[in-house]
């Protein structure tokens, strides 16, 4: 496996992250998963460092007997910074309560892990339905390297009524 277009990370580090060694059976779906989809995928290395526009394309360059040569062509793109962090759906919960749990602030580099951590911490508050929580990059401007991040929240009903009484004979 050869890497082209990578300037941020050396090929050796990308190979370690890929976890596919020379001599392993060729499996294109596993290769694509290890580049883009797995939790510790090569692409996540870039997404955690602001490279929202990262793209990797594996291409078979040579097939000989029982061997396949692959070239992974990388387009790193430019780093993206968060322009605005938008919070929607918090009708009862004060916005500063939500913002203090966020690991994503305007001006920060786009960071996939920080977004996931923010989502976990918002869910742990107990005020929002984690199943309906949505976090989406919007207003993506590749030429300026900017993106807005939209947190769409649905508050859980937490109204409680407690009644107690007593009876005594006197």
What does each of the following model-derived ranges do?
Residues 1-169:
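Periplasmic polypeptide-binding modules associated with outer-membrane biogenesis and secretion
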